[in-house]
Amino acid sequence: MAIVSTSEFKNGLKVMLDGDPCTMLESEFVKPGKGQAFNRVKLRNLKTGRVVERTFKSGETLETADVVDVEMQYLYNDGELWHFMVPESFEQYAADQNAVADAKKWLKEQDICILTLFNNVPLAVQPPNFVELTITETDPGVRGDTSGGGGKPATLETGAVVRVPLFVQTGEVIKVDTRTGEYVSRVK
């Protein structure tokens, strides 16, 4: 494993902390007027999802985590596990509820996702930034009904609920931003 010093800390860096792989969310260098400089770091534990804040004195080191991000194709969900495959090697991985988390409402079969693996075990699933999903249920848009801000809830084929404009109807395919959960456009 490689060792990183506090001077090399940056957002997105994956390190080992207390035996668990973590990713750095924020890293702030603090140089007080009196005393030794230090780094204030926010880390997310990749196994539990818990966020912790730690301080490291200048010159301290951490071990990098042997974590890889791999593009995989989503195959299916068997009720307990979500199954993914590496398109080049056809190698399959099964991710549990903790790894999939909120991404499950955006997963559609055959979509390409990014899986974070630690010791060949999926820790996190990142859906594509934009997905195209079919609307299974939404209220009909009544002309002139814009007092509510010009939007209505729509249930998608994966079960996710998104606010859409009044002109969008049931059965249409829409593009959704998975990072914000917002409607982007209709798909022709």
UniProtKB/Swiss-Prot annotation:
Keywords: Cytoplasm, Elongation factor, Hydroxylation, Protein biosynthesis
GO molecular function, one term: translation elongation factor activity
SMART domains: EFP, Elong-fact-P_C
Pathway(s): Protein biosynthesis; polypeptide chain elongation
Localization of this protein: Cytoplasm
HAMAP family in the record: EF_P (MF_00141)
A Gene Ontology BP annotation from the UniProt entry: peptide biosynthetic process
Gene Ontology CC annotations of this record: cytoplasm
Protein name (record): Elongation factor P
InterPro entries: Elong-fact-P_C, NA-bd_OB-fold, Rib_uL2_dom2, Transl_elong_fac_P/YeiP, Transl_elong_KOW-like, Transl_elong_P/YeiP_cen, Transl_elong_P/YeiP_CS, Transl_elongation_fac_P
Keyword Transmembrane tagged: no
NCBIfam families: efp (TIGR00038), PRK00529.1 (NF001810)
Stated role: Involved in peptide bond synthesis. Alleviates ribosome stalling that occurs when 3 or more consecutive Pro residues or the sequence PPG is present in a protein, possibly by augmenting the peptidyl transferase activity of the ribosome. Modification of Lys-34 is required for alleviation.
Designated gene of the protein: efp
Posttranslational modification: May be beta-lysylated on the epsilon-amino group of Lys-34 by the combined action of EpmA and EpmB, and then hydroxylated on the C5 position of the same residue by EpmC (if this protein is present). Lysylation is critical for the stimulatory effect of EF-P on peptide-bond formation. The lysylation moiety may extend toward the peptidyltransferase center and stabilize the terminal 3-CCA end of the tRNA. Hydroxylation of the C5 position on Lys-34 may allow additional potential stabilizing hydrogen-bond interactions with the P-tRNA.
Provenance organism: Methylococcus capsulatus (strain ATCC 33009 / NCIMB 11132 / Bath)
Cytoplasm found in the keyword field: yes
